[in-house]
Amino acid sequence: MTTMTTKFRDVEIRAPRGTELTAKSWLTEAPLRMLMNNLDPDVAENPKELVVYGGIGRAARNWECFDKIVDTLKNLETDETLLVQSGKPVGVFKTHKDAPRVLIANSNLVPHWANWEHFNELDAKALAMYGQMTAGSWIYIGSQGIVQGTYETFVEAGRQHYNGDLKGRWVLTAGLGGMGGAQPLAATLAGACSLNIECQQASIDFRLRTRYVDEQATDLDDALARIDRYTKEGKAISIALHGNAAEILPELVRRGVRPDMVTDQTSAHDPLNGYLPVGWTWDEYRERAKKEPEAVVKAAKQSMAKHVQAMLDFQKMGVPTFDYGNNIRQMAKEEGVANAFDFPGFVPAYIRPLFCRGIGPFRWAALSGDPEDIYKTDAKVKELIPDDEHLHHWLDMARERISFQGLPARICWVGLGLRAKLGLAFNEMVRSGELSAPIVIGRDHLDSGSVASPNRETEAMQDGSDAVSDWPLLNALLNTAGGATWVSLHHGGGVGMGFSQHSGVVIVCDGTDEAAARIARVLTNDPATGVMRHADAGYEIAINCAKEQGLHLPMITQ
């Protein structure tokens, strides 16, 4: 049946709070609450159209599917598993109590047809849904979900290029959507000013309201004057500017303005829905996308080419310039910018050594809705990892500066060994009553062992295995076997159709012994696949980590 097509509903969704169950167990209550949390108006970019973030990244295929998912989760037995196919609940099957309660597959296409044109045809027929990464896998926590990764990137860039000190320096970037909205706060936390260009005033307003950006300039001259003043004063202030990056970056080049760092996080991965062509209004863009999609895609990619050319010009000035994973270089290359890949992606430039040790975006949310539960887990993290001053600094800054969106949540980058240690501790806190309700633990699909994305996470692998996508499939299979609460397998997140495959995992800490056993398996195995993947590619850091952690890798450690 393909007649269910309602994508707009004027309704406000918020997850239940407290300890009263609306489902039959916490293992089904958790995905229910996190699905609804993804559509909380304080969390999602366009919740009335089911869009969570990232262009058209949705939580459910349409409202009829959302209703049926909610109803099914409320009635799901403790030994049943719900299957979700591109945002549509398609089956409930008898499994067992340690099996996942939900298995999700979003946006997956046979490789020959894995492109936006074919996907958009399916989407128009209500046969597919773009799940992005954490939108369709129900573990989005707002812009906080990427803040620390962006912060770690800026800090490492500062270490490499500016002797570890970003005071008095400024970052030029664009995009203040659900992901890009993390950039201004991350730059501030790293000690730098930032100029953040955004073409939708509503997105700027959202970031101002949630304190991710400090202030808005009236025009480019005003923005540059503020940057000049704040950098001279050594203040780390973030500035939003309403405009089109494909116009403003070339103008900055023309003026000879020299930022200290340049990147971008517009929704360039989706030219039909996420990147405004030069000279167009947003309303015109959306209307023409319906009537003449091919022309719109062409116009958007032409503007991306101008944007990337300006980034290349900044690189020629000696400005550290990097792609932040939105595939804008690929789009520009397809429009004739032959050297678009002359500036690197952020993973090979700054993050890969962390991935080699299984370190990535570990996140958790308090199903109670009580911020105190998160503050107590913050303290537990510090207690269990007493010597990591960098992590403690992050947690302190996060508590001070990051506003919770929807259910209270936290993210911190930790790796193999520590994830299981923290998960077991959180489960014990639930068992003892120290936390008022269960905790869910998940992560971004952007992690060390869960993604194949040659223009982002697996760019420039030293053995040339950038495009091998067996790894996220193995990761999903292993997490399913280990007893995760829900597991997802997606295509196209971050960089768009045809350019990535990736998997997600979420596990519930409900305070039971059974949960502890599942947590120990899943939160060990999941980051271990990242160490395995990088060790297999020949990275010495990963090989040494595998040996230190006692991983059984037949071709490497035996």
Curated annotation (Swiss-Prot):
It catalyses: 4-imidazolone-5-propanoate = trans-urocanate + H2O. GO terms for cellular component: cytoplasm. Its cofactor is NAD(+). It comes from the Bacteria. It is found in: Cytoplasm. Its main location: cytoplasm. Catalyzes the conversion of urocanate to 4-imidazolone-5-propionate. HAMAP family: HutU. This is Urocanate hydratase. The gene is hutU.
